[in-house]
Amino acid sequence: MKETSKNQPSEDLKSVKRLHRHDKSIMQSILKFLYQPIDPSSLGITRVLFGFLMIFDITQERGMVYINLRWGDPKACEFPLLSNLPILSADWMHILYLSMIAAAIGICIGFYYRIASIWLALGHWYLILIDKTAWNNHTYLFGLFTIFFSVTNANRWWSVDGVLNQKINNVHIPRWNLALFQFQIFLVYFLAGVKKLNSDWITGSSVTTVGSHWVFAPLRLLLTTQQISQYVLHYGGLIFDLIEGYLLFFNITRPLGIALGIYFHICNSQIFTIGIFPYAMLATLHIFCNPDWPKKVIMRLSPRWRKYFLLDTPPKYSASNCYYNDYNPDDTGSRIQQFNSQNRLTMAILAGYVTLQLFLPFSHFITQGYNTWNERGLYGYSWDMMVNSWSYPKIKILVVDLSNGKHFIGGADSRFLRWSTYPSMIKQYGNCLAKQMKTSYEIKQPAVYLDIWKSMNGRFRQRLINPKVDIVSAPWSPWKKTPWLMPLLANLTNWRNKMPELKKRYSIDDKSRIIRFYADFPGYTQEVPVPAALQANLTVLEGQVEVNASRYIYKLNPKMTIRLPSNVTHTVTVTSERPAAYFYRIENATLARILAEEKENIKNRVEDYSPKSYLTYFSTSVRFVTGNIIEFLKSKVLIYYHIAINTFDAIQNIIESENITDSTLDSVSPSNN
C-alpha cells in the first residue's frame, strides 16, 4: 500500500505528459492542415469574379447612384451604428465611392491587390457603420469577403502583381486561405436553413407574392400558385439551404449541389431585387471543388487560348508560408520547417473567428434593444434570409411643444423608411426630428410621438410601438428589451389563413377594390381619413370597437359592418378587453368605371386567329423582348452617365472649395513689409 502511494505522483505526472503530447499532436495536425500547400488558381478565380461584381455593387446597391439624394440634404436624418463616427459630405462621398471602384478593379485584376483589398474593406465597412438602413445579409457577407481578401493570398495566380513579381506568380497558398471562404459559404447556407425552421416559413406565410412569377411558369402546368409558394418556394427553399453546404462539400454530391445552386440563384436573381447577391453566390460555388480545377478546365481549350493563362504546376516548396510533408533537410527551398508563434496565432485567430460566426446569429439575447417582434438583432449577421416580409408602413408623426402645448402633425419621408422597423433607428429618428423642430420651427421643448403600423408575414397590420410614448425621452439600450415596443398580436395569427377567403369573397380581382386588415390593442384609437373618391366599409372580425364618424358613434361587435362617409376622417377605438381585429373594404368608384369600360372594349374587339396572326403575335413577342433588353441597356447607360456627371461635379466642387479656402487664407495673412 505504501509503495503504491509512493509511486502515485510519478504515474500522474506521466499521465499529464501523455495528455500534453496528445494535445500537442492535435494542434500539430491542425496546423499541418491549415498550412497544407494548395494550388492558387481557384482562389484566383474567386478574386477576379468578386472584384468584377463589386464594381456594380458599389455603383448601384451601395448607393453611388443616389449619393446626392441620400447624403446631399444636411437636414436628413442619419442612422449610424456609432453616433460619433463622422459622416462625409456628398461631394467627398463621391470620392470615397470612386476610390472603392478603383479598389474593386485592383482586386479584379490583382494590381496592388493587398492595398486594394484593405481599402475596399475600410470603405465598405465605413458605409455599413454610418447607415444601418442599408444593412442586409449580403452587405454583411460582402464585408466579410473584403476582410478575407485582405488577409489571404488571392493574387498568386492570374494577377498583374504576379506578372510584375515572378516570386509570387503561381506559387502555393496555405489551405486556410480557401477554407476560410468555404466555411463562410457553408455557414450562410446552413444557418439560412436553420433560421427558416419557424412557423411562419413552414406554413408558407413568409413570401406569398412570388408564386405567380414567370420563373415558375413550367410548374404551373402541374401546381397552383399557392402550391408553388408552399411546396417549391418555402419547403424547397428550406431543404435547399439545409443541405446545399453538405452537397457542395462532398465530392460525390458536388455536381448535384452545383446544379441546384445555379438554378436556385438564377431564380433568386429574377424574383427578388437583391442586387448582385445571387451572382456572388454563383461565383463562389466552385470554391468547394479541387483547388486546381481552373487549370484542368483551361487545359481543354485550344493552344491559342491557353497561352493567356499560367498553367504550370507550382514548383516544389514554392511558398514560404506553406508546410510540406515531404520536407528534405538537404533542400534549401523556402517553406515552413517548424511552426512558430505566428502560425499558432493565425490558428487562434481563425478559431476565434469560427466561434464568433457560430455565436453571432444566436446572440440576440444579449443585444435585446435591436430586436423587433420575432426578427432578432440588427438585420445582417443573423442570416434571416427572406424569413420576414413587411408591409409598407403607415406612419403618423405628432410633435408637441411641451412649453406651450402646440401640436404639429405630419408624415415621414417615403424615400427611406427602413428605420421604421427597428427600435434603435426609431429612437434615432425621434431625436433627429426633435433637433430639426428646434432649429427650423423654434420649438423649445419638442416631444415626438410616432404611430407606426406594420404587418409582418401576412398578419394584421398593427402598431409597432406605443404611440403614447415620447420617443425623445423614451429609454433605449442595446442591452435591454425596448419597453415601448408593442407586442406582436400572435393570438390573432389564426386569422391569416382566413384572409385569402375574405379577399376572394369581398374583393373582385381588379385594381379598383382593396382590403386592409387591422388589429389594435384595448383602449387605443386609430384615425383613418376616407378621401372623397373612395367608398369604404368597415367589418369587425374579433373584439368590439367604437367608430366615431361625422359626429355619430357606432358600437360594433364581430360580424357587424358599417358604411363610412367619404371625405371624412373617422376614428376607431377598441372597447373590448382583448385586442380587436377588423378590416376595410375600399373601392375607387372612378377607377372601377374606367376598368369596366376597358373590359367592355376588349370584349367587343374582334380578333383574327389566322396563321398570319400567329406570325404577327410571334414577331410582336420578339419585338417586346428585344425592346425590354434595349430599355434595360439604356437604363444602365443612363445610370452610369448620371454617376459620372455627379462625380465630376463633386470633384469640381471640392477643387473650388479648396481654392476658395486658399484665397481666403491669402487675403487674411499679414503682408511682409
Predicted ranges, named:
Residues 1-673:
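Alpha-helical membrane-anchoring segments
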